[in-house]
Amino acid sequence: RMVMPEFKSHTAYLAKVFGTTQHSEMYANEAIRTCYVADTPFVSQVAKSITKDAVLEKIVAMNDSLRMDFGCTKPKIAVLALNSEFGDEEKNTISQAVEEAKSSGFIVSGPFLSETFFDAAEYTRFDGVIGMYRDQVVGPFKALAFDNSISYSLGFPKICVSPALTVNYDQVDKNITEESPLAMAIFAASDLLEKREQYTELTKNQLK
């Protein structure tokens, strides 16, 4: 009998292993890199998860990863709106987080309405995109270029990469699963590790 895991994702498991609550999941491919703020699968709980501190935390995490792991010296980050029209969350929470990040030196813009942002290909002007909840970014991500995509865990001391696929437990032990996404994740992990080591070497012993 198959024993189902007690963790909702490998990211949650790794967070316990590394002893951290400050983590996030990034989806990345050649077209776009994106993550999201509200770590809940329930739409009814999304709005209360959107706080200024939560948005700022994701901006910092994505900025750090883009610099350390993806070789972006001055990352440009876009932040999406929660609603289809500008409401209280955009005015009182997301905009404040964006402005505070700007005042701290981050190159960040938003909030953008997600429909027009993706329809007009605005994402091509940015190194990373932060959505407010998972489905807001995963749908466009898959539509743009799902092949050769990875899921990358931000905020961990080690490089943690997996294929950007849903786990198909019904395919276990049937020898029918496509292996190329796993190979892509392994190659991506190697590239990310190399870039992080280069970043560490370039930034150590800097003059104050």
Q: For each predicted feature, which ranges?
A:
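Anion-binding alpha/beta catalytic cores of soluble intermediary-metabolism enzymes, centered on
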Residues: 1-208
